Amino acid sequence: MTLAAYKEKVKELPLVSIFCSCFLSDPLKKQTYKYEADTVDLTWCAISDMEVIELNKRASGHSFEVILKPPSFDGIPEITATLPQKRDPSLEEIQKKLEAAEERRKYREAELRKHQAEKREHEREVILKAIEENNNFSKMAKEKLAQRMEVNKENREAHLAAMLERLQEKDKHAEEVRKNKEATR
């Protein structure tokens, strides 16, 4: 264990664990802790790599000094972390990877072409629909205009016929009045 790893290990331990959750080497001889108000029994913990010294006792509490002992590397075999050596890839593996990459590239291109074709088809459908709606609108407008012109023509002809008929009646009436006037003379 390196010194840096040891420091990290100590940082990870909670303070309560450092003071009170220590294990004796022999669990059969483990002392039982008796809780008394406002006291801490330092003999209950057996910590092999740290030393706790009581500095002074006050009415407000205790103060301690915790001295961490350096780790001893006696009897611990040296562990060297070696990564397994990477072997050189064979020509077949390289070829397989290249083929797989080519397949992925072709698949992506096909998907892109498919997406673009769908987009163009949608745009074409939208344009055709707009043209069809425009043609329908033009056709309906022409039909309405033709119908209104026909109605106007019929109304005009009927109005002219009515005016002509009234004029003829006036002429008849005037002719009768002239005849009556001449007959009375």
Swiss-Prot record:
InterPro entries: Stathmin_CS (IPR030514), Stathmin_fam (IPR000956), Stathmin_sf (IPR036002). Keywords: Coiled coil. Residues 48-185 form the SLD domain. GO terms for biological process: microtubule depolymerization; neuron projection development; regulation of microtubule polymerization or depolymerization. Residues 90-185 form a coiled coil. The keyword Coiled coil applies. One of its GO terms (cellular component) is cytoplasm. GO terms for molecular function: tubulin binding. Residues 165-185 are annotated as: Disordered. Residues 166-185 have a biased composition (Basic and acidic residues). The keyword Coiled coil applies. Nervous tissue. Pfam families: Stathmin. Belongs to the stathmin family. This is Stathmin-4. It comes from Xenopus laevis (African clawed frog).
